[in-house]
Amino acid sequence: MTTKLIPAQQYHDIFIAGQPLIDLRAPIEFDRGAFPSSVNLPLMVDKEREKVGTCYKAQGQQAAIALGHSLVHGVVKQQRIDAWLNFLSANPEAYLYCFRGGLRSQLTQQWLQEAGVTAPYVQGGYKGMRQYLIGVIETAPSQQPLLSLSGMTGSGKTDFLRLRKEAIDLEGIANHRGSSFGKNIDPQPTQINFENQLAIALLRHQLGNHACLLLEDESFLIGRSALPQSFYSAMQTADIVVLEEDDDIRLTRLLDEYVHKMHLGFSERLGLEAGFEAFSHYLLQSLGSIRKRLGGKQYQELQDMMQQALSQQLNQNQTSQHMAWISLLLHKYYDPMYEYQLQKKAGNILFRGSHQAMHEWLDNY
């Protein structure tokens, strides 16, 4: 058998290119974390892997290998090979990887060669590539200056970032808009997948030779996605630019984001009746998540206003009443909290301005 190995020195190229990858690990391993360009076509499923692992601990490697062969043979073995062959037929440049680039990769490569197809496997496997990406995140702040984009809730920071080549959209990677109402219809990635996608975005950003790395001024947690500690610490000391927007535009933007887009998304996913129920639950649950910080009286006032707005929307198909609770939430909760947090970093502020002024300032940064 000819062993074709992709060395660790090519990790950078693998992630920059979005190299198609076959992840040979069991589904339970894949679900904890993998890479964006990978597909899970396991050598062993969860129960098979568990049995082999138990055997390895009790009887050693050779006994575990023998058990693995007895579990994956005949029709089952052929089904696994066919799945790999089908993927490789559509993606002939794909690489294989298992946890450490060991027995599972080698055995899969051997079976594929016996079927007439050569597929290289990645040295170090998942563990090696994962450690490489962790290193990318840890060293990224030293590669170029960080610039933090701040601005009141509803000022359009995400829309602004998406127009800038020197920016990375952390909320896009986390699939969460950062605030208590920031949940999206689709779930957030696992913590490992969030970190892996962030690292790959950083690698690609570094190719652009930009003057800075522009990021939204985020909390440590974006929904349930935690920014890596070293990266978050670097963000806390970064220079700040503040995006300014008129109140009426902020309110209109939040009405669109919290109400129109979320209602439409739930309705398209679940149908009109179930969609409206899920949308209502999203709003009320989001408000409930900040109940303690609002205090009982203000929470009750906002909840009553929200339920009245939902009733109007359901019965009259109008959303204007939502503006009342959004306005109160902004002016009594979000804005004071934002001003307090920004004041602590006032010495780091380099510039304040509108969307247009901010674009012009950054173009000359």
Curated annotation (Swiss-Prot):
Alphabetically ordered keywords of this record: Selenium, Transferase
EC number, UniProt record: 2.9.1.3
An example Gene Ontology biological process: tRNA wobble uridine modification
Disulfide-linked positions: none
InterPro entries the UniProt entry points to: Rhodanese-like_dom (IPR001763), Rhodanese-like_dom_sf (IPR036873), SelU (IPR017582)
One annotated GO molecular function: transferase activity, transferring alkyl or aryl (other than methyl) groups
A Pfam entry, by short name: Rhodanese
Reactions mediated catalytically: 5-methylaminomethyl-2-thiouridine(34) in tRNA + selenophosphate + (2E)-geranyl diphosphate + H2O + H(+) = 5-methylaminomethyl-2-selenouridine(34) in tRNA + (2E)-thiogeraniol + phosphate + diphosphate; 5-methylaminomethyl-2-thiouridine(34) in tRNA + (2E)-geranyl diphosphate = 5-methylaminomethyl-S-(2E)-geranyl-thiouridine(34) in tRNA + diphosphate; 5-methylaminomethyl-S-(2E)-geranyl-thiouridine(34) in tRNA + selenophosphate + H(+) = 5-methylaminomethyl-2-(Se-phospho)selenouridine(34) in tRNA + (2E)-thiogeraniol; 5-methylaminomethyl-2-(Se-phospho)selenouridine(34) in tRNA + H2O = 5-methylaminomethyl-2-selenouridine(34) in tRNA + phosphate
The Rhodanese domain, residue ranges: 15-138
Domain of life: Bacteria
Active-site positions on this chain: C98 (s-selanylcysteine intermediate)
Database matches in PANTHER family: TRNA 2-SELENOURIDINE SYNTHASE (PTHR30401:SF0)
Similarity comment text for this entry: Belongs to the SelU family.
Complex formation: Monomer.
Described function: Involved in the post-transcriptional modification of the uridine at the wobble position (U34) of tRNA(Lys), tRNA(Glu) and tRNA(Gln). Catalyzes the conversion of 2-thiouridine (S2U-RNA) to 2-selenouridine (Se2U-RNA). Acts in a two-step process involving geranylation of 2-thiouridine (S2U) to S-geranyl-2-thiouridine (geS2U) and subsequent selenation of the latter derivative to 2-selenouridine (Se2U) in the tRNA chain.
Protein name: tRNA 2-selenouridine synthase
Organism lineage string: Bacteria, Pseudomonadati, Pseudomonadota, Gammaproteobacteria, Alteromonadales
Gene, per the UniProt record: selU
